[in-house]
Amino acid sequence: MTTSEYGSRRSDDDQWDIVSGVGYTALLVAGWRALDTVGPQPLAPDEYAKYFIAASGDAYLNDQLAHPPTSVDETAFPRLYGVQTRFFDDFFRSAAAAGTKQAVIVAAGLDSRAYRLEWPSGTTVFEIDLPQVLEFKARVLQRHGVEPKARRNEVAADLRTDWPATLHAAGFEPGQPSAWSVEGLLPYLTADAQDALFARIDDLCAPGSRIATGALGSRLDHDQLVALEQTHPGVNLSGDVNFSALTYDDKTNPAQWLAARGWVVEPVRNTLELEAGYGMTPPAVDVRLDAIMHSEYIVATKP
């Protein structure tokens, strides 16, 4: 399969693994994290991301790591996903510092925070994803002798099924505060699926719980992205993936949904605002990309 085939049209009951369909986006993002890590100023170094790329055998991503891009345009997506990674890293650090002992990573993919971050003693990280994705991640990291820095409990479940029951079985305590990340997932959900996901999370959250959600491309116009690439010959920003074919539009804004149910929502930020907060000056390509992708990052607390 070529990278251009990964952006095939979705169906509501489609299936995937780490090298196909929506699952490939997790591998692609891991590749961008790996590229940002070897860049000049990584915001959230992920030394483990390269292991997933090597194990996948994906020709495109392995070639990228063997010959890392260097121009400000070519490194746009690695840089922007570095910003996104830092946002969610900081969210979990803040929650842990406040005493939250349960972290839930929804659609965990190749997220390595259970292994990367310094978690306080007694913290449990619950990773929700398909069994084949979780198995791939654990197998690759075990092969390299990497151990989690918190209790890591796998929640092997499809989000379209009764995953809260599986989460309970994995030891989750709904009576205790928890911190939830929904990173990069919402564009791939239908409106009904997004509402159902947030309703279930709301039901599982005790007072004092927190949620962070966001995506670099909350809405994405693939044709505009292609047009931007054409103005920079030789630059492949998207990895040949048609994200528009994998995503759904016309959904309730997450900040509005959470606020309507009593959550206290912090000011919503986009990628450019995050970059500025991290002491960066967004280059022109980042400004153009954000106009195309409409990034937004949200943190909310349940009173």
UniProtKB/Swiss-Prot annotation:
Keyword Methyltransferase: yes
Any one GO molecular-function label of the UniProt entry: methyltransferase activity
Keywords (A to Z) from UniProt: Methyltransferase, S-adenosyl-L-methionine, Transferase
Enzyme class per UniProt: transferase
Signal peptide bounds: none
Coiled coil (residue ranges): none
One Pfam family it belongs to: LCM
Keyword Transferase: yes
EC number: 2.1.1.-
InterPro entries reported in the protein's UniProt record: Ppm1/Ppm2/Tcmp (IPR007213), SAM-dependent_MTases_sf (IPR029063), SAM_mthyl_Trfase_ML2640-like (IPR011610)
One of the protein's GO biological processes: methylation
Positions that bind S-adenosyl-L-methionine: 129, 158-159
Domain of life: Bacteria
Paired cysteines (S-S): none
Family label: Belongs to the UPF0677 family.
NCBIfam families: mthyl_TIGR00027
Function in brief: Exhibits S-adenosyl-L-methionine-dependent methyltransferase activity.
Protein name: Putative S-adenosyl-L-methionine-dependent methyltransferase MMAR_2791
